[in-house]
UniProtKB/Swiss-Prot annotation:
<comment type="similarity">
    <text>Belongs to the ribose 5-phosphate isomerase family.</text>
</comment>
<comment type="function">
    <text>Catalyzes the reversible conversion of ribose-5-phosphate to ribulose 5-phosphate.</text>
</comment>
<dbReference type="GO" id="GO:0006014">
    <property type="term" value="P:D-ribose metabolic process"/>
</dbReference>
<feature type="binding site">
    <location>
        <begin position="28"/>
        <end position="31"/>
    </location>
    <ligand>
        <name>substrate</name>
    </ligand>
</feature>
<feature type="active site" description="Proton acceptor">
    <location>
        <position position="103"/>
    </location>
</feature>
<dbReference type="GO" id="GO:0005829">
    <property type="term" value="C:cytosol"/>
</dbReference>
<comment type="subunit">
    <text>Homodimer.</text>
</comment>
<feature type="binding site">
    <location>
        <begin position="94"/>
        <end position="97"/>
    </location>
    <ligand>
        <name>substrate</name>
    </ligand>
</feature>
<dbReference type="InterPro" id="IPR020672">
    <property type="entry name" value="Ribose5P_isomerase_typA_subgr"/>
</dbReference>
<dbReference type="InterPro" id="IPR037171">
    <property type="entry name" value="NagB/RpiA_transferase-like"/>
</dbReference>
<protein>
    <recommendedName>
        <fullName>Ribose-5-phosphate isomerase A</fullName>
        <ecNumber>5.3.1.6</ecNumber>
    </recommendedName>
</protein>
<comment type="pathway">
    <text>Carbohydrate degradation; pentose phosphate pathway; D-ribose 5-phosphate from D-ribulose 5-phosphate (non-oxidative stage): step 1/1.</text>
</comment>
<keyword id="KW-0413">Isomerase</keyword>
<feature type="binding site">
    <location>
        <position position="121"/>
    </location>
    <ligand>
        <name>substrate</name>
    </ligand>
</feature>
<dbReference type="GO" id="GO:0009052">
    <property type="term" value="P:pentose-phosphate shunt, non-oxidative branch"/>
</dbReference>
<feature type="binding site">
    <location>
        <begin position="81"/>
        <end position="84"/>
    </location>
    <ligand>
        <name>substrate</name>
    </ligand>
</feature>
<dbReference type="InterPro" id="IPR004788">
    <property type="entry name" value="Ribose5P_isomerase_type_A"/>
</dbReference>
Length: 220
């Protein structure tokens, strides 16, 4: 079974968490694209969606799913998003697609965060996947120097601008033993908008697609 087929399995299982008449928060990325496509099959049962990126917004609108601004809605019952890595506490690395800031905001504004992924994303220790850090452009070099002091190797994601008009430093070389602590340390660097660790507020449920079927995992 291919990774893409496993992603589809996880996306299909996530549909079971969608309550009729609600607004669904949607993340960004290849796994979420499968979920959005499936959401289109039940669009008459939901009120609409709040999207974490221009790319997801375009996909939702192409399926005629109403898209709301976060400021126009209250607490969102459910947020569905993928991950680049998850540990067994459902602390995540996200942001490979560059939408980490809006993803983190919508996840925080949601009652339940269901993460969907293929089984390869579950790891014992976070950090093999480079950790994205979104930075204000003028602060990029300064932030990079501070990341080096924390033991990371930041690489400027050239030619990429976030939906917020900022830049990304993909940070290599981190073995992240205390994800929540590092998340706070990085976010305290002046010029950092946010980083791709979702550890202070981890996912509530992890749905993994695997050759054996769907695995549902809750935090340790």
């Amino acid at each position: 079974m291919s990774p893409d087929e496993m992603k589809k399995l996880a996306a299909k299982a996530a549909l079971e968490h969608v309550e009729p008449g609600t607004i669904v928060g949607t993340g960004t990325g290849s796994t979420v694209n499968h979920f959005i496509d499936l959401l289109g099959t039940i669009k008459g049962k939901i009120e609409g969606a709040v999207s974490s990126s221009e790319a997801s917004t375009a996909r939702l609108k192409a399926l005629n799913i109403p898209v709301y601004e976060l400021n126009a809605v209250g607490e969102i019952p459910l947020y569905i998003d993928g991950a680049d890595e998850s540990n067994h506490y459902l602390q995540l690395i996200k942001g490979g697609g560059g939408a980490l800031t809006r993803e983190k905001i919508i996840a925080a504004a949601s009652k339940k965060f269901v993460c969907i992924a293929d089984q390869s994303k579950l790891v014992d220790i976070l950090g093999t996947f480079p950790l994205p850090v979104e930075v204000i452009p003028m602060a990029r070099s300064y932030v990079a120097r501070q990341i080096v002091k924390l033991g990371g190797e930041p690489v400027y994601r050239e030619g990429f601008i976030t939906d917020n008009g900022n830049q990304i430093l993909d940070t290599h070389g981190l073995s992240i033993m205390e994800p929540a602590k590092l998340e706070g340390q990085l976010n305290n660097i002046p010029g950092v908008v946010t980083n791709g660790l979702f550890a202070i507020y981890p996912a509530d449920v992890l749905i993994l697609g695997s050759p054996e079927g769907v695995k549902t995992i809750y935090p340790k």
